[in-house]
Regions:
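Structured helix-beta-strand junction loops
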Residues: 33-34, 76-77, 117-118, 132
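Short, well-structured N-terminal submotif of metal-dependent ribonuclease cores
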Residues: 1-3, 7-39, 54-68, 144-145
Length: 145
């Protein structure tokens, strides 16, 4: 399973972004695959908050457009909504303690804990995830050799 961070969703819809083409191509390929893609609630809510915010987006989506994007995403048979399970707090606590971080990286630790708990790979363009050593993650815009 791959778990999607909010930045993947935002780049996929934001045609003004320099990362749009690469991330949209990556996401389209992932959606067409047999692999399960997990969308955490925090990523879905973050997408709605940021994609519709004129201070965050040059051309923000309307609420209806943002909801339609998520509806279309959740309609794929290989896309599931991801929520914390019984081990989440222990994993989150351990990640924050080992990385000696919290503050602005608390949500990153939450996403890392979700991915670890679900045996998944986190997909994000955010390099801060490298501080969580137990996490498997991939950056869709990273150059491949």
């Amino acid at each position: 399973m791959k778990i999607l961070d909010v930045n993947v969703l935002l780049y996929a819809v934001n045609s003004a972004s320099t990362h749009h083409v690469v991330v949209k191509r990556w996401l389209d390929a992932a959606l067409a695959s047999d692999e399960t893609l997990g969308v955490p609630w925090v990523a879905a809510l973050g997408f709605l908050r940021i994609a519709t915010n004129p201070r965050a987006m040059t051309t923000p989506l309307t609420p209806q457009q943002a909801l339609a994007f998520l509806d279309a995403l959740f309609a794929y048979p290989n896309v599931v909504q991801i929520a914390p399970g019984k081990e989440h707090w222990a994993l989150l606590r351990d990640l924050i303690a080992k990385a000696q971080t919290a503050g602005n990286l608390t949500t990153d630790a939450h996403l890392a804990a979700l991915a670890i708990e679900h045996g998944a790979e986190l997909c994000s363009t955010d390099g801060d995830f490298s501080r969580f050593k137990a996490l498997r993650w991939v950056n869709p815009i990273a150059k491949t050799a």
